[in-house]
Amino acid sequence: MKDWTGNDKSIYSTLGASNHTEKERETNDYYATDPKALELLLELEDFSHFIWEPSCGEGHLSKVLKNHGFDVLSSDIVDRGFEGTQVLDFLTSEAPKGMPRDIITNPPYKFAKEFVKHALDISTNTTKVAMFLKLQFLEGKARRALFEKHPPKKIYVATKRFVCAPNGDFENAPSSAVAYAWFIWEKGYTGDPIVRWFN
């Protein structure tokens, strides 16, 4: 299966600053999100009943959403064994038919900008897009252009470090040196972002 760039090996190299060496990068840039990060977000932000998790991996975020009663569509570019995963490339996918869904995910960092842009492109003005991203996503000329066109409505900055586990292995994951934040978009919003802190 080819990845988003046409690479049939589906192995991505690291771009930008990172506490991981290129050798440590996982296939398809897979780093599972600490479920606690989403648990805390759900205490701060309301979402629609219908959610799409387009980088579901082994279901760490999808399980949290289901436990909170959401109707969750889980997909990924590869099947990592989470029951109900739809195998598809989010960047070439259309919005699900029927009820509009908010999008909540931790995208592959190398394609984070593309994930944000595509999520907003296929969203309606009634849906939210929530991305768990490195705080350094705020940097860069290309991303500045994205922010000028599509400013996030809220940015929830984590005051404590969360671990994103290589290959979903939290037991052996090293402690994190990376600052993360939840970026929340509402299509059509044109104001300044509201910055808040959590955890």
What are these model-predicted stretches?
Residues M1-N199:
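Class I S-adenosyl-L-methionine-dependent methyltransferase catalytic core
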